[in-house]
C-alpha cells in the first residue's frame, strides 16, 4: 500500500510504502487444499502474537507517562525538602584509614563514620558516608530533610524520564516475551503433530504396498 501526503496547495510532501503481511493473512483464509490445518493455526497464532504486541505499545506508553508524572512529583518534592549540610566526624577510632585495608581487598571509595551536624539550632548525630582516610574533626558533606534527619541526595529530575522509559519498555517486553513464548510453544507442538502425521502416512503407505 502506498500513501502520499500533500500540503494545502496540493504539492506532494511525503510518499511512503507500507507493506502488510498479505501472505500470512492469505494463508489463514486460503482454501488451498495444500495448506494444512496446522499451517492455518500457526498463522493465526502468529497474527495474534503480532497484534497483541502492537496493541500493547499505547498501553506501555500510557504506563510510562504515568510513571513519569509520579516520579517527577517525588523528585520535585525531594529537591524542595532536602538540603545540603556539613557534618563533623566525632570518633577517630571508628574511622578506617585507607592504608590499613587488606591488600587483597578491592580499594574502598567510601566508608561509614560517626558524625554530628546542626540544623536549625538542633544538634543531631549518626553514621555518614566519607572518603577513606577521614579523621576525627574532618568535615563531610551530607543531605538532610526539613527536620534535620539524614537522607540520601535528591535524585535529578531527569531520572523521571529514564524511569518512564524503563517502565514502558519493561511492560512491552514482558507482553512481547509472553506472546513470543506462546508462539514458540505452539510451533513446537504443531511440529510434533506434523511429524506424527507424516509418520502415520508413511506407515500407511508401507502397509498398503505389502
From Swiss-Prot:
Segments passing through the bilayer: 43-63, 165-185
Q: Which InterPro entries match?
A: MT1774/Rv1733c-like
Which UniProt keyword terms apply here?
A: Cell membrane, Membrane, Transmembrane, Transmembrane helix
Q: What highest taxon heads this organism's lineage?
A: Bacteria
Tell me the compartments it is located in: Cell membrane
Main location class: membrane
Q: Give the protein name, as stated in the record.
A: Probable membrane protein Rv1733c
Amino acid at each position: 500500500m502506498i500513501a502520499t501526503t500533500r500540503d494545502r496547495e496540493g504539492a506532494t510532501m511525503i510518499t511512503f510504502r507500507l507493506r502488510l503481511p498479505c501472505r500470512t493473512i492469505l494463508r489463514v483464509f486460503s482454501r488451498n487444499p495444500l495448506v494444512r490445518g496446522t499451517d492455518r493455526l500457526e498463522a493465526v497464532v502468529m497474527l495474534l502474537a503480532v497484534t497483541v504486541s502492537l496493541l500493547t505499545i499505547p498501553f506501555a506508553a500510557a504506563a510510562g507517562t504515568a510513571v513519569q508524572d509520579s516520579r517527577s512529583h517525588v523528585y520535585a518534592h525531594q529537591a524542595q525538602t532536602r538540603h545540603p549540610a556539613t557534618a563533623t566526624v566525632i570518633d577517630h577510632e571508628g574511622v578506617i584509614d585507607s592504608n590499613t585495608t587488606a591488600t587483597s581487598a578491592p580499594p574502598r571509595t567510601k566508608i561509614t563514620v560517626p558524625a554530628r551536624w546542626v540544623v536549625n539550632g538542633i544538634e543531631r548525630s549518626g553514621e555518614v558516608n566519607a572518603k577513606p582516610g577521614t579523621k576525627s574533626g574532618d568535615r563531610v558533606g551530607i543531605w538532610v530533610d526539613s527536620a534535620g534527619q539524614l537522607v540520601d541526595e535528591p535524585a535529578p529530575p531527569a531520572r523521571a524520564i529514564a524511569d518512564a522509559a524503563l517502565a514502558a519498555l519493561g511492560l512491552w517486553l514482558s507482553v512481547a516475551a509472553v506472546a513470543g513464548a506462546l508462539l514458540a510453544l505452539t510451533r513446537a507442538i504443531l511440529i510434533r503433530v506434523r511429524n506424527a502425521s507424516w509418520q502415520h502416512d508413511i506407515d500407511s503407505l508401507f502397509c498398503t504396498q505389502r
